[in-house]
């Protein structure tokens, strides 16, 4: 879906299509490729040498292997745009691979992270871009109408930021599922939105930093509140999953604070203490 979306958007901007690599294209995509005067290919090959820009939009688990398969066929000066949700370290390794294995050719690997739902935003979905040719890629995508932000000079920087964002957004999504389902069960869904209004009115950065800054000294009391919220879910025939993990984090913080009291007052001090005493990996 992502590849077809951006293919169509680039065609509408007047770019030429060299070809599409797709094992099982649907009829609409195949027709669009044919209408653009190109062909659908089952694998990377010599046809890639005609491209100035190659866009990869596959699953993150195969991002590196696909790049390795494309690399021998890429022309000097090509920009390879990886739009997969791949591991940041793999993106860095691909960037290094492009520098080492290009055999005298300049191959520019650029990491592009999609930070929204393409099925909703289409080619206007916000993007994060990182790599030596990030500025070029930004200029390439900006005419499509979305936000395109350069976030780093090394491949992997965009992917890393997207995954950091996912800690918050996917965690919030999981809690939203449990919260709204419980509210619906209790007949309080509309009233819930009203009592959450103060959160709507608080800038996200202010909210996050306040939560972290006050988390440690209030962890024991807040853990009890989370336990009561879990019991309320259970009384309504629901089995908490995300909220159980939330309670465990508050309990771990409370235990650590009892052993090694936190005496700081700033967000930075709280982050350092939590990283050392609560979230650090244990052998």
Listing of model-derived features with the role each one plays in the protein:
Residues 17, 40, 108-110, 148, ...:
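Hydrophobic beta-strand scaffold residues
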Residues 22, 56-59, 83-84, 152-153, ...:
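Glycine- and other small-residue-rich loops at beta-strand/loop junctions that grip anionic moieties
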Residues 44-112:
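Rossmann-fold NAD(P) dinucleotide-binding segment
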Residues 63, 86-170:
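Rossmann-fold dinucleotide-binding core
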Residues 161-264:
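Helical "substrate-binding/catalytic lid" subdomain
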Residues 251-283:
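NAD(P)-dependent dehydrogenase/reductase Rossmann-like domain
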């Amino acid at each position: 879906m992502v590849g077809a979306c951006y293919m169509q958007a680039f065609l509408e901007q007047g770019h030429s299509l060299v070809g599409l690599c797709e094992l099982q294209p649907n009829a609409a995509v195949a027709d669009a490729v044919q209408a653009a005067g190109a062909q659908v290919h089952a694998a990377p090959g010599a046809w890639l040498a005609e491209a100035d820009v190659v866009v990869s939009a596959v699953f993150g688990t195969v991002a590196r292997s696909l790049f390795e398969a494309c690399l021998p066929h890429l022309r000097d000066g090509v920009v390879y745009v990886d739009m997969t949700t791949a591991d940041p370290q793999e993106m860095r390794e691909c960037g290094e691979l492009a520098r080492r294995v290009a055999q005298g050719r300049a191959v520019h690997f650029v990491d592009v992270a999609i930070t929204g739902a393409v099925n909703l935003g289409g080619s206007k979905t916000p993007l994060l871009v990182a790599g030596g040719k990030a500025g070029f890629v930004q200029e390439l995508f900006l005419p499509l109408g979305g936000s395109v932000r350069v976030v780093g000079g090394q491949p992997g920087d965009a992917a890393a930021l997207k995954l950091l964002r996912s800690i918050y957004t996917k965690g919030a999504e999981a809690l939203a599922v449990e919260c709204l389902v419980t509210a619906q069960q209790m007949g309080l869904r509309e009233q819930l939105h009203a009592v959450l209004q103060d959160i709507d009115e608080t800038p996200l950065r202010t909210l996050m930093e306040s939560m972290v800054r006050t988390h440690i000294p209030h962890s024991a009391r807040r853990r009890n509140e989370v336990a009561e919220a879990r019991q309320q879910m259970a009384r309504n025939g629901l089995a908490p999953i995300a909220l159980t993990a939330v309670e465990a984090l508050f309990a771990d913080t409370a235990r650590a604070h009892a052993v090694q009291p936190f005496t700081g007052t700033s967000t930075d001090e709280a982050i350092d203490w939590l990283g050392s005493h609560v979230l650090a990996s244990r052998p």
